[in-house]
A protein has these predicted regions:
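Surface-exposed extracellular loop regions of Gram-negative outer-membrane beta-barrel proteins
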Residues: 1, 45-72, 81-113, 117-134, ...
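Surface-exposed, low-complexity loop segments enriched in small/polar and acidic residues
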Residues: 1-48, 60, 64, 74-75, ...
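Flexible, surface-exposed loop regions and adjacent strand-edge segments
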Residues: 1-9, 78-86, 117-123, 165-175, ...
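Extracytoplasmic loops and strand-loop junctions of Gram-negative outer membrane beta-barrel proteins
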Residues: 28-37, 72-73, 105-109, 130-135, ...
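Outer-membrane beta-barrel signature, preferentially recognizing the C-terminal barrel domain
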Residues: 79, 177-228, 257-282, 317-324, ...
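Solvent-exposed loop/turn elements at secondary-structure boundaries
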Residues: 137-211, 230-266
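Conserved small-residue
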Residues: 162-165, 169-171, 181, 280-381
């Protein structure tokens, strides 16, 4: 910053309220900048209170209930992360054969504007222990336990956009007082140099919680009193994902401060299989074998994108971790073939020679550029199949 002192020649005890400031340093700024403050420790404050209820009515009806209040503050930087919420669970079982469960969460976050900080997230699940029915008795020697279940509910997240550079407080502007253009005033030997403000990110006052609509259908069974098998089909539809408005043209002047909005939608679905075999080979000695298998796939349902010139450049409807690249059409056989093919000087630094890879000119403009990249694999770096023993 600039440093000043009172010019002793300009001050008089007869008029002490009038004086002239004399600048001491020749360069500086009219504001004080503050860089990030490093921390060598994290701390968490967590408080929760919980009430539980459990009762059985007669021999057929069982009820349990839980109500919990939670308050959390996590600090690993100058600004802490604060959350508050109320959650509950109610379960009902009829003869331990027909099962129902209702859960809810009423959660709040400081990241959103007033009126949008709290949201309600309910969930419901049903189960049927088929092996408890009388008609199952002939099968008990093969299948000791068989249960079908299903659930559907909403889950919320306030971390939306935080890993992609969104501000902590989404509802306020993030301003850098010295990040804008600059100007100088005054004579050359004592000019005043100033920089204007710049906007790092604009306030998103209508931001909401990110949501996931989760659906699961599963089966639990036990075979020959030794093998436990669990199978699930799941489908998660995530919406209100906070993303920058990529469709807004640069001529609007936002540059790196393009506004954020809850516009993203992603679908993730798949199956999970778990097998556990346990047997007592002889007294005191057990053999335990566990295995699992998971298959998942995902895609963008909706994503705000620029006005790409070619349809193959869009991401909506495609997997998140897909691989893009050029389509290889073989190898160049001669220099004559190189001369007659679309120019691909922009790929690699070496001069093309016979034996180099020949790429397809997808858009037909006579040269190989970034516009010729297409999705060459839907799998990418994230495996769809995972398994373990």
């Amino acid at each position: 910053p600039y440093w000043y002192r009172v010019d002793p020649k300009s001050w008089s005890p007869d008029n002490p309220g009038e004086y002239t400031l004399e600048r001491l340093n020749s360069s500086g700024s009219e504001y004080i900048s503050q860089s990030g403050i490093g921390r060598g420790a994290d701390n968490t404050f967590y408080f929760h209170g919980q009430l539980n209820y459990e009762n059985t009515f007669g021999e057929d009806h069982g009820v349990t209930a839980m109500l919990m209040y939670m308050q959390r503050e996590y600090r690993n930087d100058v600004l802490p992360n604060r959350n508050q919420g109320l959650s509950g669970r109610l379960t009902y079982a009829f003869r331990q054969k027909y099962l129902a469960e209702f859960n809810f969460g009423y959660n709040g976050t400081e990241r959103l504007d007033k009126g949008k900080r709290f949201e309600f997230f309910p969930a419901m699940s049903l189960g049927w222990v088929v092996s408890s029915e009388k008609f199952w008795q002939p099968l008990e020697k093969y299948v000791d336990y068989f249960k079908v279940r299903g659930s559907y509910g909403l889950v919320g997240s306030d971390e939306t956009g935080s890993y992609d550079g969104a501000a902590h407080f989404l509802y306020v502007n993030n301003v850098n007082l010295g990040g804008g253009g600059s100007y100088s005033t005054g004579p050359t030997y004592s000019s005043i140099y100033k920089k204007g403000p710049s906007i790092n990110s604009y306030a998103v006052q209508n931001a909401h919680w990110e949501r996931v609509k989760k659906m699961d259908i599963g089966v639990d069974m036990k075979l020959f009193n030794q093998v436990d098998i669990t199978f699930d089909y799941f489908c998660d539809k995530r919406d209100r994902i906070l993303m920058r408005r990529a469709s807004w043209p640069a001529l609007l002047g936002y540059v790196s401060a393009t506004p954020w909005s809850n516009i993203g939608k992603v679908e993730n679905k798949g199956i999970e299989l778990g097998v556990n075999w346990k047997k007592e080979v002889f007294k005191g000695f057990h053999v335990d074998f566990r295995g699992n298998f998971t298959y998942t796939e995902n895609k963008y349902i909706d994503k705000d994108e620029p006005a790409y010139p070619y349809v193959w450049q869009t991401e909506t409807g495609k997997p998140l971790s897909r691989t893009t690249g050029y389509i290889a059409e073989g190898l160049f056989r001669s220099q004559e073939e190189i001369d007659d093919s679309p120019a691909q000087d922009g790929i690699g630094s070496a001069k093309l020679m016979p034996g180099d890879i020949k790429y397809r000119d997808v858009n037909g403009d006579g040269k190989i550029t970034e516009d010729d990249k297409v999705m060459i694999s839907p799998y990418g770096t994230m495996p769809r199949i995972q398994y373990g023993l």
